[in-house]
C-alpha cells in the first residue's frame, strides 16, 4: 500500500482544483452580465444534462434579453448603448393657454429673455456700432500716434 500509481501522483500534483481555472476579467464580466454557465467544461457522464440546462432559458435571462436583440451578448449590448448618442427629448408642440402665457411672460413675445429682447438690443447695438466706428480703446491708442493729434508734447 506504500506504492502509488502514476494517476494518483498526477491528481496530487495538480491539487484538488486542477480542473478549475482561475477566473479572469472576462469571466467575471460574463458572470456579472448573467452568462455564468456558458464557459464551463461538461464533466464525463453528465454532458446531456448540462446541455439541456445551458440551453434552457431562465426567467432572469429572458427578462434581461427583452430589451435587446437576442444575437447580441450582454457585454456587446452594454458597450453599444454606452457609445450610441442619446436622443434629445421631443418637445410638446401643443401647449395649454396658461402655460403659453407664462412662457411669454418669462421669455418675452419673441421667445427670448427680456434682457436680450428688442428693447435691450438697441443699447448693445449702439455700443457695438461705436466700436465699429473707431472709437474703441485700440483705435484711440493708434490715433494717438498719428501726426497732428494727441498731446502738444508729442507734436
Curated annotation (Swiss-Prot):
Taxon lineage: Eukaryota, Metazoa, Chordata, Craniata, Vertebrata
Membrane topology per record: Peripheral membrane protein
Predominant location category: membrane
GO molecular function: structural constituent of myelin sheath
Family membership: Belongs to the myelin basic protein family.
Biased composition (Basic and acidic residues): 37-49, 123-134
Keyword Phosphoprotein attributed: yes
GO cellular component, one term: plasma membrane
InterPro entries referenced in this protein's UniProt entry, alphabetically: Myelin_BP
PROSITE patterns: MYELIN_MBP (PS00569)
Domain of life: Eukaryota
Subcellular localization(s) per the UniProt record: Myelin membrane
Region feature Disordered, mapped onto this chain: 1-70, 109-155
Keyword field: Acetylation, Cell membrane, Membrane, Phosphoprotein
Protein name: Myelin basic protein
N-acetylalanine PTM sites in chain numbering: 2
Described purpose of this protein according to its UniProt entry: This protein may function to maintain proper structure of myelin.
Protein's organism: Heterodontus francisci
Amino acid at each position: 500500500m506504500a506504492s502509488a500509481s502514476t494517476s494518483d501522483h498526477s491528481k496530487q500534483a495538480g491539487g484538488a482544483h486542477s480542473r478549475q481555472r482561475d477566473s479572469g476579467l472576462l469571466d467575471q464580466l460574463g458572470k456579472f452580465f448573467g452568462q455564468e454557465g456558458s464557459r464551463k467544461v461538461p464533466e464525463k457522464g453528465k454532458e446531456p444534462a448540462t446541455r439541456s440546462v445551458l440551453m434552457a432559458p431562465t426567467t432572469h435571462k429572458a427578462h434581461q434579453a427583452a430589451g435587446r436583440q437576442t444575437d447580441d451578448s450582454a457585454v456587446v449590448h452594454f458597450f453599444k448603448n454606452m457609445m450610441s448618442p442619446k436622443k434629445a427629448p421631443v418637445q410638446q408642440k401643443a401647449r395649454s393657454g396658461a402655460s403659453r402665457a407664462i412662457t411669454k411672460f418669462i421669455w418675452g413675445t419673441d421667445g427670448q429673455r427680456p434682457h436680450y429682447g428688442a428693447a435691450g438690443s438697441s443699447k448693445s447695438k449702439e455700443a457695438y456700432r461705436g466700436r465699429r466706428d473707431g472709437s474703441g480703446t485700440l483705435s484711440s491708442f493708434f490715433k494717438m500716434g498719428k501726426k497732428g493729434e494727441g498731446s502738444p508734447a508729442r507734436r
